[in-house]
Regions:
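Transmembrane-helix signature of 12-pass secondary carriers
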Residues: 1-307
Length: 307
């Protein structure tokens, strides 16, 4: 019983901590942007790629120490003895109940992922245009302009993820108190409204201080609901499979968003205003996510489903 009560808060906290890496990246990027020169003639983005590779090496040692939970090991052994296949995409996509949950959740998740990965994470393009305009009056040289833009783009990432951390914690908490579907709907609505705010109205660097945290709150807050809700839609034999399907296929679908934004931008003249408008049009997909939520079950205060 204690594990059941703690599961949702723990998942929400774990998901929110994912922003810490982005916060660190933003702070490091700001430091690189402030540096007068970089070693080996590196450009700011090249230095960030090198720094970003280090955690991947660290994760190898961490993963080597992680072990499967004993409860999962026992459940898998018991399931296999009964002939239950674990991790079967065939079972996931052909079972009447689980396939229904998988497909509708995929649509809802894809909407939120497109909002972040396909639209919101391209806010540095807007930041760059703002910084260029404000820095032109200062007669900065080419290298100075590059460092200035790198600083503010990294600052934007920092602001976004401060809001994202709070958003994930808040939406995960609301999912526990209001219910999964109401929290999901609110998170998608916040994502949509905050995207409109940034893409239409962010025009000065001072706007970044409050608009980007709001966008991070909305767009990343959706992921706090994913962490709590998705595992509750599938049985033990398909829990990670179903969650992975909804999230990772959603990421593949989100990969089409930048191409769509690019095409719309080109149709609208190819300038920054065209890009802003394109982002606004594509953000309408977030409303589709809200529209399909009634097709999914409410799982608040329900035991995890089983075969």
């Amino acid at each position: 019983m204690r594990c059941r009560i703690a599961r949702a808060p723990a998942l929400g906290l774990l998901q929110s901590i994912s922003t810490w890496g982005n916060l660190a990246a933003g702070a490091i990027g700001m430091g690189i942007g402030l540096a007068a020169t970089l070693p080996f003639g590196l450009k700011p983005w090249q230095a960030m790629f090198i720094v970003g590779a280090l955690p991947a090496l660290m994760s190898v040692f961490v993963l080597a120490k992680l072990k499967e939970p004993q409860k999962w090991v026992d459940a898998r052994a018991a399931g296999l003895a009964k002939g239950i296949k674990f991790g079967s995409y065939k079972n996931l996509l052909t079972h009447p109940r689980w396939s229904r949950n998988a497909w509708w959740a995929l649509i809802a998740c894809s909407a939120g992922i497109i909002g972040l990965w396909g639209i919101g994470n391209f806010h540095p393009k807007i930041v760059g245009s703002i910084v260029e305009g404000e820095a032109a009056a200062r007669n900065l040289t080419g290298p100075e302009m590059a460092s200035h833009k790198a600083f503010w783009r990294s600052a934007g990432l920092l602001f976004q993820n401060i809001g994202g951390f709070i958003g994930m914690l808040s939406m995960a908490k609301l999912a526990q108190t209001w219910g999964r579907r109401p929290a999901f709907a609110l998170a998608l609505l916040c994502s949509f409204l905050s995207t409109v705010l940034v893409f239409k109205f962010m025009r000065q660097t001072t706007d970044m201080y409050w608009m980007l945290p709001l966008m991070g709150f909305g767009q990343l807050g959706v992921f706090g609901v994913y962490a709590v809700y998705l595992p509750e839609l599938f049985p033990t034999s398909l829990r990670s499979t179903g969650t992975s399907f909804c999230y990772n296929v959603g990421r593949l679908l989100a990969a089409t968003a930048p191409f769509t934004v690019s095409k719309i931008t080109a149709k609208l003249g190819g300038d920054i205003e065209g890009f802003r408008t394109a982002g606004l049009w594509v953000s309408l997909v977030l409303l589709l996510g809200i529209a399909v939520l009634p097709m999914l079950p409410e799982t608040k205060d329900q035991p995890l489903p089983e075969e």
